[in-house]
């Protein structure tokens, strides 16, 4: 019998994640750490939200770069929102924002808006 469930990939959803940047940037030379961090965040969003297009919020970019190119935060709390594109109703994209928390070592949660 065929699977009759609808795929959850096409739904609009928002989730909070904690991403361990130190694990992803270990061994990267100093002058490439912050640019690589942005690339790793985009790859993380593509993998977890299963969209090709990822848009990074300017506040997240400032959060990554606030201590310079070398000293990227060890952990970041991210809010990933899968949204519908304005041009094409079927196209989905992921919008990545930084979440300001005192302790970023929290669990992944689903955000109700």
UniProtKB/Swiss-Prot annotation:
Q: Quote the subcellular location field of this record.
A: Cytoplasm
Q: Name one GO cellular component term.
A: preribosome
Which key words tag this protein in UniProt?
A: Cytoplasm, Ribonucleoprotein, Ribosomal protein
Entry keyword Cytoplasm? yes
Q: Which GO terms describe its molecular function?
A: structural constituent of ribosome
Q: What is its main location?
A: cytoplasm
Protein origin, superkingdom:
Eukaryota
Its GO biological process annotations read:
cytoplasmic translation
SUPFAM superfamilies hit by this protein: Ribosomal protein L31e
The UniProt entry, under InterPro entries, shows: Ribosomal_eL31, Ribosomal_eL31_CS, Ribosomal_eL31_dom_sf
Reported function: Component of the ribosome, a large ribonucleoprotein complex responsible for the synthesis of proteins in the cell. The small ribosomal subunit (SSU) binds messenger RNAs (mRNAs) and translates the encoded message by selecting cognate aminoacyl-transfer RNA (tRNA) molecules. The large subunit (LSU) contains the ribosomal catalytic site termed the peptidyl transferase center (PTC), which catalyzes the formation of peptide bonds, thereby polymerizing the amino acids delivered by tRNAs into a polypeptide chain.
Oligomeric and partner information: Component of the large ribosomal subunit (LSU). Mature yeast ribosomes consist of a small (40S) and a large (60S) subunit. The 40S small subunit contains 1 molecule of ribosomal RNA (18S rRNA) and at least 33 different proteins. The large 60S subunit contains 3 rRNA molecules (25S, 5.8S and 5S rRNA) and at least 46 different proteins.
Q: Which family does it belong to?
A: Belongs to the eukaryotic ribosomal protein eL31 family.
This chain's protein is named Large ribosomal subunit protein eL31
What organism does the UniProt record list as the source? Schizosaccharomyces pombe (strain 972 / ATCC 24843) (Fission yeast)
């Amino acid at each position: 019998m065929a699977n009759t469930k609808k795929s959850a990939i096409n739904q609009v959803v928002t989730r909070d994640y904690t991403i361990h940047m130190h694990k992803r940037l270990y061994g990267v030379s100093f002058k490439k750490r912050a640019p690589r961090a942005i690339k790793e965040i985009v790859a993380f969003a593509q993998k977890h939200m299963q969209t090709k297009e990822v848009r990074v919020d300017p506040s997240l970019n400032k959060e990554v770069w606030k201590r310079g190119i070398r000293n990227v935060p060890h952990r970041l709390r991210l809010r990933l929102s899968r949204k519908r594109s304005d041009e094409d109703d079927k196209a989905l994209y992921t919008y990545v924002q930084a979440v300001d928390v005192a302790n970023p070592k929290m669990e992944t949660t689903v955000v109700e808006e």
